[in-house]
Amino acid sequence: MPKATLVSPPFVDAHFHLDATLSLGTPRLNRSGTLIEGIALWGELKPLLTHEAVLERALRYCDLAVSQGLLAIRSHVDICDDRLLAVEALLEVKRKVAPYLHLELVAFPQDGYFRSPTAATNLERALDRGVEVVGGIPHFERTMADGAASVRALCEIAAARGLRVDLHCDETDDPLSRHIETLVCEAQRLGLNGRVAGSHLTSMHSMDNYYVSKLLPLMAEAGVAAIPNPLINIVLQGRHDTYPKRRGMTRVPELRGAGIPVAFGQDCCMDPWYSLGSADMLDVAHMALHVGQLTSREAMRFCYDAITVNPARIMGLEHYGLDVGCHADLVVLQAKDPIEAIRLRATRLFVVRRGEVIAETPERVAALSIEGRPPKVDPAAYAPRES
């Protein structure tokens, strides 16, 4: 065992798309790198999906996730397929991985709740079959008015069923895309406080500062959480810019300063939208730290919380953490502390679920053959004295 180790609660990903994961190149690659081409590609892929293929890819991804210490995932699943093929496949995945990974599913109308003719019916069917969170994509509706109406309808469904809400909200560079304010209003109106999240919120990056100063207190009052997806936001946003080119990720320091719960999601891994990814939430935090300029020691520790305790709270995970009485779920990392874990994207030495080691990785130590220098290099040994 290395001298520098950190015992951490497991990583939690509050925003992912398990139905599309590991499908890179099928039926073709995203040449433009844009969100819109990614959605079009997914539309081409959907008719080709089989239950077995979705199941196999999702289970392979869960294997990778566990090896990285990622033991809880909230995955959106597209319901704009009348077969509900991906829904059925991921419900089976949920049952299969339950002994070692918590999987929560969001009914996601990828093609628009109103824009897709059967989305409303399919969403209810998915919820009836056991999908437990209501999703949406208001900025993809045909008009701003339809987008706002979809937010109201989806929140009413969640309130009637006693479910949580997690909408893809304002994933655009358009500063006038303000569906988050409708989401906040509906959370207050329907008593959904603490059960609602807005994912992405990239338009906030471009909004007028005065408007944001009004919006943030309303989000805090309604208990609406924010789930940026740093790896994807920095890649997909700003595609219509020349220079200067916007970073796209929402205003994380300001959200945090307003007392709004913030968690970072990975969103994609080797799929129509993103050709990279490795199920490594430390990679997500590392990108968020850079894009959001979250470089104070306190802010870097917050970035670690945004991939552990914060998403666990947003998802309502019970018995999560290292306190007495919690599940014995933990990760042992080859790092001195959370900041070093992010800096190094530290090796996950042991992953423990309910007290049993379910994954382990040898410590990362390089052997040197340089005269007069030490024979081995442990990257974790380079930590500053105070971090």
Language model regions located:
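Di-metal (Zn2+ and/or Mg2+/Mn2+) metal-binding site signature of metallo-dependent hydrolases
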Residues: 5-27, 172-173
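Active-site gating loops and adjacent loop-to-helix segments of metal-dependent hydrolytic enzymes
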Residues: 21-54, 130-133, 179-197, 220-225, ...
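Histidine/acidic residue-rich metal-binding segments in metalloenzymes
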Residues: 85-99, 116-225, 241-264, 320
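Active-site-proximal loop/turn and secondary-structure-junction residues that shape catalytic pockets
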Residues: 79-81, 109-113, 140-142, 171-175, ...
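His/Asp/Glu-enriched, well-ordered alpha-helical/loop segment
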Residues: 164, 185-196, 229-236, 246-333, ...
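Alpha-helical scaffold segments that flank or form the walls of functional sites
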Residues: 6-7, 24-76, 84-96, 121-128
